[in-house]
Curated annotation (Swiss-Prot):
Co-factor: note: Manganese or magnesium. Binds 1 divalent metal ion per monomer in the absence of substrate. May bind a second metal ion after substrate binding.
Enzyme kind, highest EC tier: hydrolase
Gene that specifies this protein: rnhB
Protein name per its UniProtKB record: Ribonuclease HII
Domain RNase H type-2: 17-207
GO terms under cellular component: cytoplasm; ribonuclease H2 complex
Length: 217
C-alpha cells in the first residue's frame, strides 16, 4: 500500500496561518498518565505515512515519531498525572496536558491551533476542534503519534515497577489480563482510582525492589 500524507483541509491552510496540531493519548486506560503533543510541520518537508496513531503498527509509530522530532518545525510533549486525572476528571486532565504542550511552544500571533475531537483547551490564540482530526490533518496526526509513543515508553518504564500487571502489553488499558491482575493484586499508586474498575480497590505493594532503589538513588 502506498504511503500518503494526510492533506490539510483547504480552509485551514488559508490566511497565512501557522498550524499547530494537537492530540492526546491515554484517556481510556485504567493506569498511568494521559499524554498530549503539539506539532508544527514544515510544509516544504513532507513526512510520508502520517496517519491516526491507532491505525499504525508500533514499529511504524516509532519510526514516524523519530522523523517528526527531526523534521518538524516545532514539537512538544506534555502530560497530566494520575493524581490530576482523579482530581479533575479525565477530560479536564487531557485538556490540561494539551494546554501544557501548546503553551510550551509559545505560539506566534498568527497561530491556528487545531485540536482533535470536540473539546479544546483554553489558550490565548485561535483554536478550532476537528472531529477525526487525527485522520484528516497532518499536524494532528503527527501529534497523535508523538503522544502515543511517549505514553507507551512511560508505561514500559512503569512495567518495571509493577511487572505483575503487564503494562508492557496492554499499556494500562482494561484488558481481561489487566482486570484479572487488579482482582488478584489490587491497584497501585499509578492506577486511576476514579475509574470504575479501580474504585474501592486496595492499593497493592506489588512494586519491584529494583525500581524502588532506582527511584531512591
Amino acid at each position: 500500500m502506498a504511503e500518503r500524507r494526510i492533506p490539510l483541509k483547504h480552509e485551514y491552510a488559508q490566511d497565512g496561518k501557522v498550524i499547530y496540531g494537537v492530540d492526546e493519548a491515554g484517556r481510556g486506560p485504567l493506569a498511568g498518565p494521559v499524554y498530549a503533543a503539539c506539532v508544527v510541520l514544515d510544509p516544504a518537508d513532507v513526512i510520508e505515512g502520517l496517519a491516526d496513531s491507532k491505525q499504525l503498527s508500533e514499529k511504524k509509530r516509532i519510526s514516524l515519531a523519530d522523523q517528526i522530532k527531526q523534521r518538524a518545525r516545532a514539537w512538544a510533549i506534555a502530560s497530566a498525572s494520575v493524581e490530576e486525572i482523579d482530581r479533575l476528571n479525565i477530560l479536564q486532565a487531557s485538556l490540561l496536558a494539551m494546554q501544557r504542550a501548546v503553551v510550551s511552544l509559545r505560539p506566534i500571533s498568527n497561530a491556528l491551533v487545531l485540536v482533535d475531537g470536540n473539546h479544546a483547551p483554553r489558550l490565548d490564540c485561535e483554536v478550532q476542534t476537528v472531529i477525526r482530526g487525527d485522520s484528516l490533518v497532518a499536524e494532528i496526526s503527527a501529534a497523535s503519534i508523538l503522544a502515543k509513543t511517549a505514553r507507551d515508553i512511560e508505561m514500559l518504564r512503569l512495567h518495571e515497577a509493577y511487572p505483575v500487571y503487564g503494562f508492557d502489553r496492554h499499556k494500562g488499558y482494561p484488558t481481561k489480563a489487566h482486570l484479572e491482575a487488579i482482582r488478584l493484586h489490587g491497584i497501585t499508586d499509578i492506577h486511576r482510582r476514579s475509574f470504575a474498575p479501580c474504585v474501592g480497590q486496595s492499593v497493592s505493594g506489588a512494586r519491584t525492589t529494583s525500581f524502588i532503589n532506582q527511584k531512591e538513588a
